[in-house]
From Swiss-Prot:
Family: Belongs to the 1-acyl-sn-glycerol-3-phosphate acyltransferase family.
GO molecular function: 1-acylglycerophosphocholine O-acyltransferase activity; 1-acylglycerophosphoethanolamine O-acyltransferase activity; 1-acylglycerophosphoserine O-acyltransferase activity; 1-alkenylglycerophosphoethanolamine O-acyltransferase activity; 1-alkylglycerophosphocholine O-acetyltransferase activity
Biased composition range(s): Polar residues: 503-522
Membrane-spanning parts: 43-63, 92-112
UniProt keyword Ubl conjugation, yes or no: no
Gene behind this protein: lpcat4
Name of the molecule in the record: Lysophospholipid acyltransferase LPCAT4
Residue positions the entry lists as glycosylated: N166, N517
Organism the protein comes from: Xenopus tropicalis
Catalytic reaction annotation: a 1-acyl-sn-glycero-3-phosphoethanolamine + an acyl-CoA = a 1,2-diacyl-sn-glycero-3-phosphoethanolamine + CoA; a 1-O-(1Z-alkenyl)-sn-glycero-3-phosphoethanolamine + an acyl-CoA = a 1-O-(1Z-alkenyl)-2-acyl-sn-glycero-3-phosphoethanolamine + CoA; a 1-acyl-sn-glycero-3-phosphocholine + an acyl-CoA = a 1,2-diacyl-sn-glycero-3-phosphocholine + CoA; a 1-O-alkyl-sn-glycero-3-phosphocholine + acetyl-CoA = a 1-O-alkyl-2-acetyl-sn-glycero-3-phosphocholine + CoA
UniProt cross-references to SUPFAM superfamilies, sorted A to Z: EF-hand, Glycerol-3-phosphate (1)-acyltransferase
Keyword Membrane: yes
Gene Ontology terms: cellular component: endoplasmic reticulum membrane
Listed GO biological process terms: phospholipid biosynthetic process
Entries under InterPro entries matching the protein: EF-hand-dom_pair, LPCAT1-like, Plipid/glycerol_acylTrfase
Length: 522
C-alpha cells in the first residue's frame, strides 16, 4: 500500500460497501415461522411437552439413589481405583434409565455409524460439535464413560451423584493446582491399558451453534495417547435443539425440542487417531490436527473461535478480540446514567497534562459525575487493576473517546499514542510494549502476552525501543491484518460502519498479511 492512499475514517477503498453482519458461532435464535409451524408447536407444546418433561424428570430422579448405591460404603482409597467391574448391575440400570429418559425427550432412535474402539485401543473419546445440553446422550451410546466436569457440579442434585457414579474427573477453578492434578489423572487413566473406563471430552469446552468447529482445548490431548473422534449430527428440518451462549434460553430449547414428534440424531465413530511424536510433545498441535480431521468429516470449517471466561473471542492475527466488544455496553450504561460525551475531551486533557493517572472507584465516580454505585462498579471492573486496586484513567479516557462516532479512526489512533507514549532520552515520544498492551487491552480486551507478540513483530525492523506515532498509526490504519480493528471493529455502532474484523479461518493473517511482507513501521 503506498503512502498516497487515504487513511481516513472509512478505510481503504476495498473495504467500502454495505455493512456485513459478523458471524458469531455462539449465537443461535430460532422462532417457529408460518401459521402451520406455529400451530404445531403450540398444540404439541401444550399437550406433548408437559407429558414428556414430567416423564423425563421422573426417570432422571430415579437414577439418583441407584447412582449413589454404587459408591456407597467405598473408601477414598477404593474410589481412587477403577470400580468399573464392581456392582455392574447398577451400571446396567443407569444405562437403561438414561436411554429411557432421552427417549421420553424425543430421541426415539439414534443412527450409529462406525465402531466404538475399546478402552485399551482408545482410552479417550473426543466429541464435537458441542451444540446443546442434549449432547450428553452420547455417553449412553458410549456405555457411560467418565467425563471431566467442574467440582462445583457435585453439589447439584442427581448430577453430582451421576458424576460420582462414573468416577468423573473433577476440576476446580479455585484451586491453582487443580488443573495439574487433572492432567495427571487423565494421563494415569489413559495409560491404564483399559483398566479404567474411557474418558469422554467435548474439546470445544463450550456450546456453539454447530456451523463451525470451535477451537479445541488441549486438555484431552496432554496424555499424548490415541483418541477416537466422535461426530454428532442433528439432521432435523428445524434447528430446535441448539443452545448457545446467546440466544434461546434453556426452557425455550426444551419446549421447542419436546414439542416435536421425534428428534433425529446421528453419532459417527471415526477411526482411532494415533498422534505423531511431534503431536505427542505438543498438545496444542495434536488438538489442532484432530479438529481438522473432524471438521473435514463434518464438512465444516475448523476455526479458532473460543470462549475465554464468559467472553466469546475471535482471533485477529496474534490477538484475541471479543466478538461483541464490551466497550459499547459500557457506553450504553453510562449514557443511561446521565454521562455525556461532551465532557470526554476535558477528561482527555487532564490525562495529557498528567493531572490524572490512576484512580480508585470513588475518584472514578467523581470524574465521570456518575452517582449510581452499580453503574460505576461495572465500569470500574472492566479495566485492569494494579496491585493497589487502582485503574489507569488513560484507559478510561480512550474507551470513552472510542464512543464518539464523529472521531475518525486515525484521530482515535493518534489519541491512543498521545495518551500512552513516553519521552525517551533523545526527546522522542515512543510507545513502549507496556503502552501498546494497555491500548489493546482497554479497547479490545487482548491479553498482554498476545499484544507483546504483535509489538515484537512491529519493532523487528527498527532500531528504536518503541513505536513512533507514525508507526503506530500505520499499524492501526494500514496494517493488512490489524487495521480492521480501528477502521471497523472499533467504530461505534451508531457510526454505521461496523464490520467484522478480517478473520482467516485458522485465525492468522494470510500470506500477504505476513509482517515480513510489510515495510518497516518505525
Amino acid at each position: 500500500m503506498s503512502e498516497a492512499e487515504p487513511v481516513g475514517e472509512k478505510g481503504p477503498a476495498e473495504d467500502d460497501g454495505e455493512e456485513s453482519v459478523p458471524f458469531n458461532p455462539f449465537l443461535h435464535e430460532f422462532e417457529p415461522e408460518g401459521f402451520w409451524q406455529k400451530a404445531r408447536f403450540y398444540i404439541l407444546g401444550f399437550t406433548l411437552f408437559p407429558l414428556r418433561f414430567l416423564l423425563a424428570a421422573i426417570f432422571l430422579f430415579l437414577m439418583w439413589p441407584i447412582a449413589a448405591l454404587r459408591v456407597a460404603g467405598l473408601t477414598e482409597e477404593e474410589l481412587s481405583r477403577s470400580i468399573r467391574h464392581r456392582r455392574t448391575i447398577l451400571h446396567h440400570l443407569i444405562y437403561l434409565l438414561s436411554r429411557t429418559m432421552f427417549f421420553m425427550c424425543g430421541f426415539h432412535w439414534i443412527t450409529i455409524r462406525g465402531r466404538r474402539a475399546p478402552a485399551s485401543e482408545a482410552p479417550l473419546l473426543v466429541v464435537a460439535p458441542h451444540s446443546t445440553f442434549f449432547d450428553p446422550i452420547v455417553t449412553v451410546v458410549c456405555d457411560l464413560p467418565s467425563v471431566v466436569s467442574r467440582v462445583e457440579n457435585l453439589n447439584i442434585p442427581v448430577i453430582g451423584a451421576l458424576l460420582r457414579f462414573n468416577q468423573s474427573i473433577l476440576v476446580s477453578r479455585q484451586d491453582p493446582s487443580s488443573r495439574k492434578k487433572v492432567v495427571e489423572e487423565v494421563k494415569k487413566r489413559a495409560t491404564s491399558n483399559g483398566d479404567w473406563p474411557q474418558v469422554l471430552f467435548f474439546p470445544e469446552g463450550t456450546n456453539g451453534n454447530g456451523k463451525v468447529l470451535l477451537k479445541f482445548k488441549p486438555g484431552a490431548f496432554v496424555a499424548g495417547v490415541p483418541v477416537q473422534p466422535v461426530l454428532m449430527r442433528y439432521p432435523n428440518k428445524l434447528p430446535a435443539t441448539i443452545w448457545t451462549w446467546k440466544g434461546n434460553g434453556v426452557f425455550k430449547v426444551l419446549w421447542l425440542t419436546m414439542s416435536q414428534f421425534y428428534i433425529n440424531l446421528e453419532i459417527e465413530f471415526l477411526p482411532v487417531y494415533h498422534p505423531t511424536a511431534e503431536e505427542r510433545a505438543d498438545p496444542t498441535l495434536y488438538a489442532s490436527k484432530v479438529q481438522k480431521i473432524m471438521a473435514d468429516a463434518l464438512a465444516k470449517p475448523a476455526t479458532e473461535f473460543e470462549l475465554i471466561g464468559d467472553t466469546p473471542v475471535t482471533p485477529v492475527g496474534h490477538l484475541k478480540v471479543a466478538l461483541d466488544p464490551k466497550i459499547w455496553e459500557l457506553g450504553n450504561i453510562l449514557e443511561k446514567a446521565g454521562f455525556s460525551l461532551d465532557s470526554v475531551q476535558g477528561l482527555i486533557d487532564l490525562c495529557l497534562e498528567g493531572v490524572c493517572s490512576r484512580v480508585g472507584l470513588d475518584e472514578l465516580a467523581e470524574k465521570l459525575g456518575v452517582t449510581q454505585h452499580d453503574v460505576i462498579s461495572r465500569v470500574f471492573n472492566y479495566f485492569h487493576k494494579d496491585a493497589s486496586g487502582m485503574i489507569d484513567f488513560r484507559e478510561v479516557s480512550l474507551v470513552l473517546a472510542a464512543q464518539d462516532a464523529t472521531r475518525s479512526a486515525e484521530e482515535l489512533a493518534k489519541l491512543a499514542f498521545d495518551l500512552f507514549s513516553t519521552c525517551d532520552a533523545d526527546g522522542r515520544f515512543l510507545l513502549s510494549a507496556d503502552g501498546f498492551a494497555a491500548i489493546l487491552r482497554s479497547v479490545v480486551g487482548s491479553p498482554p502476552a498476545e499484544s507483546g507478540k504483535v509489538f515484537s513483530e512491529l519493532c523487528t525492523y527498527t532500531e528504536l525501543h518503541g513505536l513512533t506515532q507514525d508507526g503506530f498509526v500505520r499499524f492501526a490504519i494500514r496494517h493488512p491484518c490489524y487495521r480492521h480493528l480501528f477502521l471497523f471493529y472499533l467504530r461505534p455502532p451508531s457510526s454505521g460502519r461496523r464490520k467484522p474484523p478480517h478473520i482467516q479461518q485458522n485465525g492468522g493473517c494470510s500470506g500477504k498479511n505476513n509482517p515480513r511482507n510489510q515495510s518497516k513501521m518505525d
